[in-house]
């Protein structure tokens, strides 16, 4: 992959930095794994805004990605690597020996034509999925389950990975990209390697319109609103908040802890590093 610096032919192009997709498949996505995706624009069934700053954006189909990788002991051949508009990672179309095709998250260095396999007897090779109890300590892994059989939930974004630190009894300790160390059941599955498209973080959008293509609407500052719309609103001329920073509903926003101490708190060995 390469980083593409755009010629400054306009203000929007001047700061834009794109990631090359020359190595990706150029054709249409596999129709058997596409589903319609209806845009809600952040509204619920009453038409009320439940998530701000959403709306518009380019239409696209949802690619059904296999996060469970539960087709054990059946080898699959990588047919192509594709762009997925629904996520930062690339996806790979694999064809199993019995003819079934599935999309998976594409790991780094996975080549077209490579063979991957899932199951407890799978070799330790990039793209293979195994229970954590069968993965050597110190391995780099991604697409990690939190509950056995529930499907991957951790380390699915572009360039992300985690490290298997230790195994104690029925739990393993895994260090996340954030620095958090968490206990995960050894029967949970994980995939060897790290997620591809690691240069995604170098991308520069260049102009506000790119955000609109993504379905993200502008975020207006509270001090620029009227007092009926935000606690920071109102005043003559340019004024500050006049109080501690709050959200539109009056809740503190700076230095205020929002995480609930859920029952899964006991699974965190070490909190994430700031």
UniProtKB/Swiss-Prot annotation:
Domain of life: Bacteria
Entries under SUPFAM superfamilies matching the protein: Nucleic acid-binding proteins, Translation proteins SH3-like domain
Pfam family, one: Ribosomal_L2_C
Region (Disordered): 224-256
Coiled-coil stretches: none
Keywords: Ribonucleoprotein, Ribosomal protein, RNA-binding, rRNA-binding
Biological process, per Gene Ontology: cytoplasmic translation
GO cellular component, one term: large ribosomal subunit
Compositional bias annotation for Basic and acidic residues: 229-246
GO terms assigned for molecular function: rRNA binding; structural constituent of ribosome; transferase activity
Function description: One of the primary rRNA binding proteins. Required for association of the 30S and 50S subunits to form the 70S ribosome, for tRNA binding and peptide bond formation. It has been suggested to have peptidyltransferase activity; this is somewhat controversial. Makes several contacts with the 16S rRNA in the 70S ribosome.
Subunit structure and binding partners: Part of the 50S ribosomal subunit. Forms a bridge to the 30S subunit in the 70S ribosome.
Family, similarity comment: Belongs to the universal ribosomal protein uL2 family.
Protein name: Large ribosomal subunit protein uL2
């Amino acid at each position: 992959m390469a980083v593409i610096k755009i010629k400054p032919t306009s203000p929007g192009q001047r700061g834009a930095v794109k990631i090359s997709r020359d190595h990706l498949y150029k054709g249409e996505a596999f129709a058997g794994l596409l589903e319609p995706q209806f845009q809600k624009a952040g509204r619920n069934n009453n038409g009320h805004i439940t998530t701000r700053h959403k709306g518009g954006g380019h239409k696209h189909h949802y690619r059904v990605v296999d996060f469970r990788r539960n087709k054990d002991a059946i080898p699959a051949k990588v047919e192509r690597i594709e762009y997925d508009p629904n996520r930062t990672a690339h996806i790979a179309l694999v064809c199993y020996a019995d003819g079934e095709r599935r999309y998976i998250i594409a790991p780094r260095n996975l080549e077209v034509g490579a063979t991957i396999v899932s199951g407890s007897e799978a070799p330790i090779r990039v793209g293979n999925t195994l229970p954590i109890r069968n993965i050597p300590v110190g391995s780099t892994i991604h697409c990690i389950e939190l509950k056995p059989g529930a499907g991957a939930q951790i380390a699915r974004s572009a360039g992300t990975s985690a490290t298997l630190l230790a195994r104690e009894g029925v739990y393993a300790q895994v260090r996340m990209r954030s620095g958090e160390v968490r206990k995960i059941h050894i029967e949970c599955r994980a995939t060897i390697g790290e997620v591809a498209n690691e240069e995604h973080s170098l991308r520069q959008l260049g102009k506000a319109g790119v955000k609109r293509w993504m379905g993200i609407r502008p975020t207006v500052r509270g001090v620029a609103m009227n007092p009926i719309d935000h606690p920071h609103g109102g005043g003559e001329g340019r004024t500050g908040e006049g109080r501690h920073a709050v959200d539109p509903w009056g809740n503190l926003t700076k230095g205020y802890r929002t995480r609930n101490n859920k029952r899964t708190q006991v699974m965190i060995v070490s909190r994430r590093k700031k």
